[in-house]
Curated annotation (Swiss-Prot):
Keywords: Host cytoplasm, Host nucleus, Host-virus interaction, Late protein, Virion. This is Protein H339R. It comes from African swine fever virus (isolate Warthog/Namibia/Wart80/1980). The keyword Cell wall biogenesis/degradation does not apply. Belongs to the asfivirus H339R family. It is found in: Host cytoplasm; Host nucleus; Virion.
Amino acid sequence: MAGRVKIKQKELIDSTVKNKNVMNLFHEIIGSKGNINFSVVWPKFKKIKQSVYDYISTLSVLEKASVMQNFEDDKKLLELFVQKLWAAYEGYFKYPEIEKYEVEGQVNFNLVPQYVLEKFSQLYRIRINSELVTLILNSCAFMSKYNDYILKKDPYILTITPGLCFSPIPNFEDLNFKHLYNSDKNSQHDKDFIMFILYKLYMAALGVYNAISIPDIDVEDLENIILSSVSQIKKQIPRCKDAFNKIESSVHLLRKNFNTYYSDYVGSGYNPTIIMEQYIKDISQDSKNISPRISYQFRTIIKYYRDMIATKHQTMDPQVLNLVKHVEKKLDMLDREKN
């Protein structure tokens, strides 16, 4: 059954490629024009939301714990900080628009009203790039330096780290685990509890990081778009078989290197062209023995796109233009290496 679904999905993409501009399709898959793949993004968002909730809840448990009765000033400051985090959570994540359409954890997005989907799309990037999520990611980055100690709940971490303060939360040194742990007021049970809180805080922060790192894209859909578009275009450009074969045979590089491509995509401020740029770069680097004939065929394909755009009196997207220039530059470099 799963195989049939994938075949039908590819047939749908093949049909769609015939009727849409390939770059527009790419933008839709990548989500750069406000379109997002809900079947991929919604589960990702739920994981982020749950992990953010767990992070704040862990701090809330610490704030209410009996051990904090020994640190009255710290408790008050932590209470105020947790209140601010909950307020931010309510503002960014307490939206049940799609959740109420879930049945046993699954959503048929065809049954969700369009205005609900549009609202989620508009807020999605704002939510995952919010100050709250950024704070937790920075917290994760700090704690990850002491990964082995925290996972083992080893208090030695509070000895080897420099200074008098060990605060896993950026700009909130009032939560000083060294101060809490080393107090003479604590029993061994209290000390174990403090290390457990640090562990849970790290697990929640890791949960946010791991969820954020999940691509918003179905890589298989992206592969199918590339293959289907090549299949359509090569019928219109004769005597470029070798170049098209090279593109088709190199699609495996997309899946192999996709995590790196996606990291570059996020780091570029969600510029979708960066994925294609890096992909083409890898094709050229993987093709050091490319012949002048294949190089000429690549140039013919590029010229076809230029002529097609000019014929339709369309303005070339600056990102697409940069992509074309990147390919041409790479071909020039390969040509020079041959001479």
